Structure formats: C-alpha cells, structure tokens
Amino acid sequence: MSLVTRFAPSPTGLLHRGHAFSALTAWTAARRSGGRFLLRIEDTDFTRCRPEYETALIEDLRWLGLDWDGPVVRQSERRVAYDAALDRLRDMGVLYRCFRTRKELMALAGGAPHGDDPVDAGAFTGGPLSAVEEAALLADGKPFAWRLSLNAARDRLGGFEALAWIEETADPGVKTARPEALGDMVVGRKDIGAGYVIASVVDDAEQGVTHVIRGEDLIETTSIQRVLQALLDLPTPTYRHHRLLLGPDGKRYAKRDGSVTLMALREAGVTAVELRAELGFA
C-alpha cells in the first residue's frame, strides 16, 4: 500500500531533534511505500506564528535531506474551509462559547497541551452559559473561545462507542475513542476562527492523508478528532503515534523549554548524516 503521510509543524519557534525525528519517521514511511509525503504549515494562530520560523523550518528540513510532494500547504490560507466546518458544527448545536480567561484556563489545565498554549486545554469549563449571561458578556465585548460540547455531540451521534481508529505502533490494534479524557475541548477562538483540531481533520481529509504519523503526546487528541470526523462526515486515516524523543534530562524536547535547535546543531558543525544516524535513520 502506498502511504500518504504529512509533517505539520507550527511556526512558533525553531525546530529541534524531536521535530526531526517525527518528520523523518513520516517521510521514511511514505518513501518506503512508494507513497507521498506532504508538508503542511499549521499557522492558524497568527498571534504566535512567525514567517521567519517558517523559513527556518523549511531550511532545516531540506538540510536533513527531506523532500515533499506538491506545494507547501499553509493553514493561514485555508481559513474559509475551516470556518465553514466551524459553521457546520455551530449549526448542529454542538458548540458553545467559553468566556474563561487565559489565567483561569491555565489554572484548570495544570500545564500546556499541544501548541504550548493553555487556551487549547480541554479542562471542563462549566458548559454553556444561560442566554442572558452570554448576551451580557457579548455586549461587554468579553473574548471567548468555541468549545465542543461532548454532551451535545454524544446526543447527535448516538454515543461514542462506535468511534474508533486503527493504531499501528508498538501497541497496535483498534482503539476506541474516549473523548471524555479531554473534556469540552477548544475548537476555535473569536480572534483566529477555527483552531488546530478542526483544521487538521479538514486538511487530512482534503489532502487524502492515509496515515497520520505523530508523537504519542497527541494520542488523546485523536479521540476528539474522531468525534469531529464523525460529525463532519470525514474519513478516518490510520494513526501511528511514535515514541517521544527525550533529552539528556529525561524530558521530552519542547520549544518552550529552550531545547537545542536544528539550526544551532548545524551551526555547531553537526552534519545531517550524523543527526540522522543519531535518530536511527542512517
């Protein structure tokens, strides 16, 4: 089977070894199968993404020896498609406005999830407000995020028991979606529209991605994405959640922790051949 895989970084900082490992894993799977490898820039959050980081990550990938099929897809150029999906979900009655502040969200989340941004946390926020309360907050110009109501989604789908995906990892098999672990997750914001979790399922479907290959830190997000795929009548790809690369301190590489970047390694004289060998891709 020819695989269609993708690497979808967010240009919010420079790439590190963890990114290189993930990109090489997806690229190798596609090339060994005679398939296609796609590069997608997940830059929906214009408040944090920077063009210089996109330029740098493309340079890093080329330095690693990676190539991709077709043009680079930038999510910032596809907001119409994502907002259409957001509108469909609103029309279904499965979204509600959440007016909690960033500080409140961070306190509830207890840490930073994907995107290093507490506004994406799935902690329970009390559900939708009454019409009177919501109208008052909107009249005051209070900022809000759109959250997916799991109760409403469950009612519309007749339950989550039938939602599953095929996992091809060290623990392969059919996995049942358990979206309750993340609660009512943020799927959009007033300032940027539809967020990562919607944009990714829309793009995976439109680009014909057969295998989503990414870090195991995102395995819980798959349950929410299965709910969205079911609501939006989108196909379900096969998933491979690979191990996370850990640094000398035993912690996973992360932008927010100042992990050594690929640019810094390159400037220090490390070659792409050496790094690929270190990561297991000799």
Regions found by a protein language model. Give the residues of each.
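N-terminal Rossmann-like or analogous alpha/beta NTP/dinucleotide-binding catalytic cores
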Residues: 1-114, 205, 213-217, 221-234
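Active-site cores that bind ATP or allylic diphosphates and position pyrophosphate for catalysis
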Residues: 104-253, 261-266
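Non-catalytic terminal extensions that flank enzyme cores
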Residues: 1-14, 32, 37, 133-139, ...
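Short, surface-exposed acidic
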Residues: 69-71, 236-239, 273-275
